[in-house]
Every structure is written in structure tokens, then in C-alpha cells.
Amino acid sequence: MPPAGPRGTAPLAAVVLLVLGAPLALASEDCLWYLDRNGSWHPGFDCEFFTFCCGTCYQRYCCRDLTLLITERQQKHCLAFSPKTIAGIASAVILFVAVVATTICCFLCSCCYLYRRRQQLQSTFEGQEIPMTGIPMQPVYQYPPDPKAGPAPPQPGFMYPPSGPAPQYPLYPAGPPIYNPAAPPPYMPPQPSYPGA
């Protein structure tokens, strides 16, 4: 066996430093959030330098005892969902899907109703033709024209000037109404055409 020199002690020193330095490397490890046995939520917290997270899945604290150490990987494993959490998430997902499905159904039903109504309205006018002829209408005078003013200039859209005001016809005869007391009533009931009826 060759004599142990400076080369032989180097690997041994590295192993010793690793074993003794492991707790120091693990020190200052944070405790993640957790739920205790009652289901109460506790926020995560930082441990001071040269201490690390200790305890169980349901209770955590900072310490220097390596036997009580709970690694970050073990802490994340503790975060596995409980049956209550899974049931809550499942019911929330089902409720969300139900709301979305109901909204989509209501939207589609209203669209179908409006489409059918439009089709019915179009089918009623399908065979009818509405003549669209451009018959010019005479302009309506707001005030009677002054006979001293002369003929009015032609209106835009009309070829000829208006011929003047329409003649006024009397709707009722001039003077007091004619009343004849001996005249028969305006409506006479029909007389029976055969006797005894």
C-alpha cells in the first residue's frame, strides 16, 4: 500500500466536509403553507439562518435537530389534496360547466327563434309585388298663395310650375240649411210585400 500523502487525504476531507456541511446547506429552509388536522390553513414562513423546517405535515416549526427535518419535497407531498378539497374542486368545475352550458343554450335558442321569425316574415311577403313607381306628388302649400304674387317658380324635381291653387268647391250650400217639416224621414223601413206578414 502506498503511503498516504496529501493526495490521499483530499477525498477523505471532501467526504467529511459533505457530511458536516449538509445540515448547513439544508439550513435556512422555508416552511411551506400547510393545513392542520382541523383543516385550518397556515401560511408559510421563513426559518432563520442555520435552522430549518421541522415537524410533520400537520404542524411545522423551525429547529436545528436533523431528525425532525421535513424537506421541501416532503412538504409538497403533504399538500396532496384531501377528499374535501377534491369534492370542492369537482363541484366548482361542475357548476362552472353548468353555467356555461346554460348560457350557450339560451343564446342558441334565442338565435333559432329569431331566425325562424325572420323566415316566417319573409315567406309572407314572398309572392307579393309592391309597385315602386316614381309618381311625383304636387307640393303641399302651407299657406294659400297670394293672387297678386303671380305664378310660383317650378319646384325641384318637377318639370312644370304648379298650375295654381285648386278651385274651392263649396262643401255645403251657402245660406241657412233647408228644413222641410212635411218631408218624410230620410229612412223608411221597408213595407211587407204580402198581406198578413
Swiss-Prot record:
Regions of this protein lying in the Extracellular compartment: 28-87
Subcellular location: Membrane
Topology Cytoplasmic: residue spans: 109-197
Membrane protein topology class: Single-pass type I membrane protein
Domain of life, per lineage: Eukaryota
GO cellular component: membrane
Matching InterPro entries: Shisa, Shisa_N
Transmembrane segments: 88-108
Keyword annotations: Membrane, Signal, Transmembrane, Transmembrane helix
Predominant subcellular localization, coarse grouping: membrane
Signal peptide feature range: 1-27
The keyword Signal is assigned to this record: yes
Family: Belongs to the shisa family.
Protein's UniProt name: Protein shisa-4
Originating species: Mus musculus (Mouse)
Lineage: Eukaryota, Metazoa, Chordata, Craniata, Vertebrata
